[in-house]
Amino acid sequence: MKRYYITITGTEFRHGSEFMKEGMKVKLVKEPDNEYDKEAIKVTLTPIDTVGYVANSVKTVIGECASAGRLYDKFGAETEATIMYVLPDGVIAYVDGEEVLVRDILK
């Protein structure tokens, strides 16, 4: 089964990424009413709320990570991801929601 890796970007506009650690779970929540990006997926962490967004631009996606656009139709309203690396240019995480993997199998 394919594992999806994502870049979490925009942390510098919120709470930074210094508190993020390897293994930390975050929630990915679709934001269809986002005025800037109809495929926006915000990244939340309880109790902080929004800590960033899944990168959706060639300028912000690191390496072979999936963009928000590639990931958007792979899950329902929300799913979870696990942080792998905290880098100067972004945070790398993998999506661990089972529904993402099931939707790929059914295609």
What are the roles of these predicted feature ranges?
Residues 1-107:
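Conserved active-site motif detector
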